[in-house]
């Protein structure tokens, strides 16, 4: 329905909660309240999430004192924060309830919907292995290496990276926004371009 491959959704749920085995055992209300009022560096963010949680509980008719999640208030199979739940959680099985805590069908649909709402394009590449053209001054100021690992969000374009000597086996539109990533491994560095 959303064009997101099952393997991607499965990977997210696997990484976040070991396929639902570790969804968190903290009361979400307690976690968010503590972080909102006792953690100054992120209090603005967590106050907003606490507000979103209270709205969620009211809208979904959920028991505020019983909902559990992570120490940071993330909930269910996909570890949605309250604002993400309100925007992206769906009732994928049609039973009238958006249950990401105990209903794997709703959780799967919600993760896929999250990707779709964030620009997932069915059939398009997610990443592409890249290489540096011989002669590229990778360590020079302004060279290709300075463009890698800048941000998880797109920070360059295929054309800009190509101009620095970065190539891919797959041809992409020059204007495609990418997030250049450099991974350090035993066998040497690997270069990748992450797409939106």
Question: Predicted regions span which residues?
Answer:
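Cell-wall glycan-active module
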Residues: 1-47, 52-68, 73, 83-196
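Functionally critical loop-and-helix segments that line ligand-binding/catalytic clefts
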Residues: 79
